[in-house]
Amino acid sequence: MIKRLVDIGAVKFGAFKLSSGLESPFYVDLRSVLGEPELFQWVIERYEAVLSGLEFDVIIGVATGGIPYASVLGYRLKKPMGYVRDEAKGYGTGRQIEGADVAGKRAAVVDDVLTTGKSVLNAIRAVRASGGEVAGVVVFLDRGQCGAEAVKREAGVYVYSVYKMRELLEELRPHIGEERYRSVLDYLSQWRC
């Protein structure tokens, strides 16, 4: 299934500018997985395996990449689900967290990809501001660019990942060629967390 991530363009190699502003020789967009039912199920099962080690009451998806995964996980695990907007709405109820109430509950925060940790830190702040506690953050891919360390340092919350980019890269190595493999490995080596 790992190779399917490349086949469908969920993992791409080239020159990319990330939302964090960083330049990268690879790009991971797990939204592509949503259109591939078997791969989507495989990804969900990997999330479930990681979540099985956490004690939590509610699942909170990070907008927008974490929302579909959090939705399915909430359904499958029979846990209330909600999601965190980037910022509170300027209309209606003005809420930043939609869906499940987190007050007095332990939340598992779910996102697809972690780079700098900025989006996850925003979600953690929102959960706490709404009276909840964060049991942990679960991502499919930690790009290995110090995001997990930033979350731990700034919020005291541990990030659990299905894959770290170096692990994913090792599994993809036979499918992407040595030159791409080395290029990404060299890029990742600049981050010392």
Swiss-Prot record:
Residues that bind orotate: T115, R143
GO MF terms held by the record: magnesium ion binding; orotate phosphoribosyltransferase activity
UniProt pathway: Pyrimidine metabolism; UMP biosynthesis via de novo pathway; UMP from orotate: step 1/2
Listed GO biological process terms: 'de novo' UMP biosynthetic process; pyrimidine nucleobase biosynthetic process; UMP biosynthetic process
InterPro entries listed in its UniProt record: OPRT, Or_phspho_trans_dom, PRibTrfase_dom, PRTase-like
Keyword field contains Glycosyltransferase: yes
UniProt cross-references to Gene3D superfamilies, sorted A to Z: 3.40.50.2020
Needed co-factor(s): Mg(2+)
Keyword DNA damage annotated: no
Catalyzed reactions per annotation: orotidine 5'-phosphate + diphosphate = orotate + 5-phospho-alpha-D-ribose 1-diphosphate
EC number(s) recorded for this UniProt protein: 2.4.2.10
Pfam families linked to this entry: Pribosyltran (PF00156)
UniProt KW keywords: Glycosyltransferase, Magnesium, Pyrimidine biosynthesis, Transferase
Binding-site list for 5-phospho-alpha-D-ribose 1-diphosphate: R85, K89, D111, D112, V113, L114, T115, T116, G117, K118, S119
Superkingdom of the organism of origin: Archaea
Family indicated by similarity: Belongs to the purine/pyrimidine phosphoribosyltransferase family. PyrE subfamily.
Subunit structure, as described in the record: Homodimer.
Cited function: Catalyzes the transfer of a ribosyl phosphate group from 5-phosphoribose 1-diphosphate to orotate, leading to the formation of orotidine monophosphate (OMP).
The name this protein goes by in its record: Orotate phosphoribosyltransferase
Native organism: Pyrobaculum aerophilum (strain ATCC 51768 / DSM 7523 / JCM 9630 / CIP 104966 / NBRC 100827 / IM2)
